From Swiss-Prot:
Gene symbol of the encoding locus: rpsO
Domain of life: Bacteria
Coiled coil regions in record: none
Disulphide bridges: none
InterPro entries xref list: Ribosomal_uS15, Ribosomal_uS15_bac-type, uS15_NS1_RNA-bd_sf
Subunit structure: Part of the 30S ribosomal subunit. Forms a bridge to the 50S subunit in the 70S ribosome, contacting the 23S rRNA.
The species this protein was found in: Bordetella avium (strain 197N)
UniProt protein name: Small ribosomal subunit protein uS15
Length: 89
């Protein structure tokens, strides 16, 4: 397993609802947050990488939609996820 696969498996195991759960909104948001944080660091070095910036904006939008869905379906889980990931101040 590569480093990315190990990190991904660690994130999935931390946020999954049940064993083998990879599709719940909590897991998806956590994985997107990790990728967004990595790309944010990338842009500190490569400020003119507009192609990757477009991908970043798509990921942020997708995470926002998943968070809105989770907030409507399960507000307690939403609050716990926000707290755990440190997304809101």
């Amino acid at each position: 397993m590569s480093v990315a696969d190990i990190k991904k498996a660690e994130i999935v195991s931390q946020f999954q609802r049940a064993q083998g759960d990879t599709g719940s909104p909590e897991v998806q948001v956590a994985l997107l947050t990790a990728r967004i944080n990595e790309l944010t660091g990338h842009f500190k070095e490569h400020a003119k990488d507009h192609h990757s910036r477009r991908g970043l904006l798509r990921m942020v939008s997708r995470r926002r939609k998943l968070l809105d869905y989770l907030k409507g379906r399960n507000p307690d889980s939403y609050r716990a996820l926000i707290e755990k990931l440190g997304l809101r101040k």
